[in-house]
Amino acid sequence: MSALFPSLFPRVTESLWFNLDRPCVDEAELNQQEQQHQTWLQSIVEKDNNLMPIGRPIFETFDEEEEEDDEDEEDSEEDSEDDEDMQDMDDMNIYNEFPDDGEINEVDMEGADQDQDQWMI
């Protein structure tokens, strides 16, 4: 056939793409793969388990009194900040409930003694 005309025959399928006759994985092989996966996970857990961590040693005892004092100071600071925040929120809520009672300076738009036509000039 001439190279100028395309072939009208169907293309041969790629056997790696369309392999319909491959065998299914049986239960024994699946169990073996699961066991290998579990041993792999266990080896990750146990890897370098005996190394000392960086930082404070495990045997160091902590002074509990100092920790409690620090926590008390932090709690008192947080409480005072919370009280200030609540006061601010209360002030905002009062203003939202009664907006006319606030100190708002009203502007006289008409101009008491001025001529109305003067602003056009």
Swiss-Prot record:
Pathway recorded for this protein: Protein modification; protein ubiquitination
Keywords carried by this UniProt record: Cell cycle, Cell division, Mitosis
Keyword Cell division carried by entry: yes
GO terms for biological process, alphabetical: anaphase-promoting complex-dependent catabolic process; cell division; protein branched polyubiquitination; protein K11-linked ubiquitination; protein K48-linked ubiquitination; regulation of mitotic cell cycle spindle assembly checkpoint
InterPro entries: ANAPC15
Disordered: region residues: 52-121
Acidic residues compositional bias, start-end: 61-91, 98-121
Annotated Gene Ontology cellular component terms: anaphase-promoting complex
Coiled-coil spans in chain: none
The protein's assembly and partners: The APC/C is composed of at least 12 subunits.
Protein purpose: Component of the anaphase promoting complex/cyclosome (APC/C), a cell cycle-regulated E3 ubiquitin ligase that controls progression through mitosis and the G1 phase of the cell cycle. The APC/C complex catalyzes assembly of branched 'Lys-11'-/'Lys-48'-linked branched ubiquitin chains on target proteins.
PANTHER family named in the record: ANAPHASE PROMOTING COMPLEX C SUBUNIT 15, PSEUDOGENE-RELATED (PTHR22526:SF2)
Protein name: Anaphase-promoting complex subunit 15
Lineage: Eukaryota, Metazoa, Chordata, Craniata, Vertebrata
Gene: anapc15
